[in-house]
């Protein structure tokens, strides 16, 4: 049975940028309905990238809410923090969003118990080793105030519909069961899991363009060309974990 959820399909007229904007706008809604935000809330976004989630999230919150956006902006993400800075200036959000270039395993310049909420999306998959994950979770715990919460989203390892079309099968470093154990070790409690059921379907041309931005090799295109032409690409859902300090 097909699971219910919005399916966004980019077309040549609007391009993938518009589709991704819709996707992250709805993902921000999913996150914000699951966290308690007060007028004085301080949010730290770990691994903010180029602000795909940062911008729609802060725009939906009261103007008194502050957000610290943290990213190392190195390797495949080089320059992304600079791109986010430009977006913040264009959106007039300079007074509400503070950018911090730092490794999330040791966040410099953020005091103990200074944030109410830690948010991240597609971050923990970039920390595939146990020691890397433990350092990041311990750092999030350090930064959060007592009673504060952490929420993290990541693509599920399961495609939306089995047996129909060509799917992206994501292999996350950590599934919800594993994250339950590691967050508990870090001191977190009240662990919960939800699912963000929106997805994106890419036709052949938009799929090729999108996959190139992910650094997909030419050998991949050659091997899967027939499937891509016939089915395009469909992204998996996200599992969203949250817990409290």
Language model regions located:
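Class I SAM-dependent methyltransferase Rossmann-like catalytic core
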Residues: 2-26
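Class I SAM-dependent methyltransferase SAM/SAH-binding core
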Residues: 59-106
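Conserved alpha-helix/loop element of class I SAM-dependent methyltransferases that forms part
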Residues: 22-39, 56
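A short acidic, Gly/Pro-enriched loop at the edge of an enzyme's catalytic core
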Residues: 105-118
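Conserved Class I S-adenosyl-L-methionine
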Residues: 193-244
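A short SAM/SAH-binding and catalytic strip from SAM-dependent methyltransferases
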Residues: 117-131
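Conserved class I S-adenosyl-L-methionine
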Residues: 151-173
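A short glycine-rich, Lys/Arg-flanked "PGG" loop and its adjoining helix->strand segment in the class I
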Residues: 134-146
């Amino acid at each position: 049975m097909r699971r219910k959820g919005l399916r966004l399909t980019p077309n040549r007229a609007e391009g993938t940028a518009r589709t991704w904007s819709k996707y992250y706008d709805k993902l921000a809604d999913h996150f914000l309905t699951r966290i308690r935000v007060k007028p004085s809330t301080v949010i730290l976004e770990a691994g903010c990238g180029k602000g795909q989630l940062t911008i729609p999230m802060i725009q939906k919150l009261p103007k008194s809410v502050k957000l610290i956006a943290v990213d190392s902006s190195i390797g495949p993400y080089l320059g992304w923090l600079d791109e986010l800075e430009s977006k913040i200036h264009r959106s007039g959000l300079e007074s509400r969003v503070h950018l911090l270039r730092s490794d999330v395993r040791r966040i410099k310049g953020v005091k103990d118990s200074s944030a109410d909420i830690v948010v991240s999306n597609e971050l923990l998959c970039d920390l595939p080793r146990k020691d890397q994950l433990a350092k990041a979770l311990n750092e999030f715990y350090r930064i959060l105030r007592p009673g504060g919460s952490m929420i993290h989203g990541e693509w599920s390892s399961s495609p939306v519909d089995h047996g129909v079309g060509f799917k992206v099968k994501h292999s996350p470093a950590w599934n919800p069961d594993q994250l339950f154990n590691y967050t508990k070790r870090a001191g977190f409690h009240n662990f919960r899991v939800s699912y963000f059921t929106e997805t994106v379907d890419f036709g052949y041309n938009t799929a090729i363009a999108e996959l190139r931005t992910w650094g997909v090799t030419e050998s991949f295109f050659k091997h899967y060309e027939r499937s891509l032409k016939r089915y395009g690409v469909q992204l998996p859902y996200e599992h969203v974990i949250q817990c409290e300090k």
